[in-house]
Curated annotation (Swiss-Prot):
Pfam families xrefs: Ribosomal_L27 (PF01016)
Name of the molecule in the record: Large ribosomal subunit protein bL27
Family to which the UniProt record says this protein belongs: Belongs to the bacterial ribosomal protein bL27 family.
Keyword Ribosomal protein: yes
Cellular component aspect of the GO annotation: cytosolic large ribosomal subunit
Length: 95
């Protein structure tokens, strides 16, 4: 009886690397103080890294968008959270 052993791996071929996914283009799309129209996307994100504030809606993929025409304001929400709001008038910094 003759026993023939074969290699587990194929002897030749390309490497098993060389794949990458397409970038998702996430991040802040409108900056603080910028005028936006209702429906404009403010932030594209995965999870609620930034929370919706006044006059801001949230999509099923956690995208934040303006509900009214106005000015974008990034604010703190408590100690460790951020939120973005849209106000009809520009907020003036108090001195």
């Amino acid at each position: 009886m003759i026993l023939q052993l074969f290699a587990h791996k194929k002897g030749v071929g390309s490497s098993r690397n060389g794949r990458d996914s397409e970038s998702k283009r996430l991040g802040v799309k409108r900056s603080d103080g910028q005028f936006v129209l209702a429906g404009n996307i403010l932030v594209r994100q995965r999870g609620t890294k930034i929370h919706p504030g006044a006059n801001v809606g949230i999509g099923k993929d956690d995208t934040l968008f303006a509900l009214i025409d106005g000015y974008v304001v990034f604010e703190r929400k408590g100690r460790d959270k951020k939120q973005v709001s849209v106000y009809p008038e520009r907020k003036v910094a108090q001195s």
